[in-house]
């Protein structure tokens, strides 16, 4: 799986990297895999468990490794834990762990790290009244922003016909891109009339 995503031992990946600061008698540990960026900084840690073990067993150990790596390199890595069948990804400063179908590439991980550093708060954003200016639309947009600020990855708005769902969605997309929370947003139109 790592090779499919472009990770290679000769260029951007290390196995059994020793780290200090672990909460054990020796104070040391060995990270199964560390994935590095082009600048030499660690982008991710991977905790690999046996195929017979639930991958989630490695979550806390992977977090401890990430703590040690961050203390040494001053950059919080993305956390992966896997058993070879299941892969979990965790950006623990941003979101809850989630199951993924594979490992991210070097560019994709770098984008996550960069976005984490560059994104701005959603709590006090300017909402363009030319797009969505009705009071209930503004409240809906603010509610979605607060939900994302709290670390949730999803938000759901239920709005009646004629209330400006499309304008509200466009305004949310604008806020997320302007604040560096999203680069690309897929908007699925439910009818041909909206699409045209």
Predicted regions and their residues:
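ATP-dependent helicase/translocase motor core
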Residues: 1-184, 193
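Short amphipathic alpha-helical segment within the helicase RecA-like ATPase core
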Residues: 196
């Amino acid at each position: 799986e790592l090779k499919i995503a472009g990770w290679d031992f000769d260029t951007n990946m290390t196995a059994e990297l020793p780290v200090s600061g672990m909460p054990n008698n020796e104070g040391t540990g060995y990270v199964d895999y560390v994935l590095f960026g082009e600048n030499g900084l660690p982008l991710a840690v991977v905790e690999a468990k046996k195929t017979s073990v639930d991958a989630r067993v490695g979550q806390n150990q992977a977090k401890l490794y990430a703590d040690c790596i961050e203390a040494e390199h001053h950059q919080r890595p993305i956390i992966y834990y896997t058993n070879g069948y299941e892969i979990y990804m965790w950006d623990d400063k941003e979101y809850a762990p989630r199951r993924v179908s594979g490992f991210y590439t070097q560019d994709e991980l770098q984008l996550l790290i960069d976005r984490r550093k560059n994104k701005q708060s959603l709590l006090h954003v300017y909402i363009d009244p030319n797009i969505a200016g009705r009071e209930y639309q503004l409240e809906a947009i603010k509610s979605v922003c607060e939900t994302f600020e709290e670390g949730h990855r999803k938000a759901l708005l239920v709005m009646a016909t004629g209330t400006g769902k499309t304008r509200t969605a466009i305004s949310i997309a604008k806020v997320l891109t302007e604040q560096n929370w999203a680069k690309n947003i897929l908007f699925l139109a439910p009818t041909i009339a909206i699409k045209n």
